């Protein structure tokens, strides 16, 4: 595989991972906008499943050499910070 193709695959992989992370971030923001609702176990289960799936996608991309492990960690850390804000906002209410 030539360098140009490899770079293209790496860019596409990163775009897809960031798009999936953005979907999860939207789920988090929706929940933050509706904090008046009681805590929803189904919502939490969906969010946990999405986060786990994204972590598996990132591990796969790292193993293929499409992204650096540190970049994958940054993506997950960003989402975990948003989840922490959601948790803090909910428990402080």
Curated annotation (Swiss-Prot):
Pfam family membership, one: DUF1507
Superkingdom, taxonomy of origin: Bacteria
Assigned protein family: Belongs to the UPF0358 family.
NCBIfam families membership: PRK13666.1
Designated name of the protein: UPF0358 protein Bsph_1390
Species in which this protein is naturally found: Lysinibacillus sphaericus (strain C3-41)
């Amino acid at each position: 595989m030539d360098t140009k193709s490899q770079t293209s695959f790496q860019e596409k992989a990163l775009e897809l991972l960031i798009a999936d992370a953005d979907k999860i971030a939207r789920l988090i923001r929706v929940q933050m906008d509706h904090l008046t609702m009681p805590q929803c176990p189904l919502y939490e289960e969906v969010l946990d499943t999405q986060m786990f799936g994204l972590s598996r996608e990132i591990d796969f991309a790292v193993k293929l050499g499409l992204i650096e492990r540190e970049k994958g960690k940054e993506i997950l850390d960003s989402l975990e910070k948003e989840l922490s804000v959601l948790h803090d906002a909910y428990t402080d209410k």
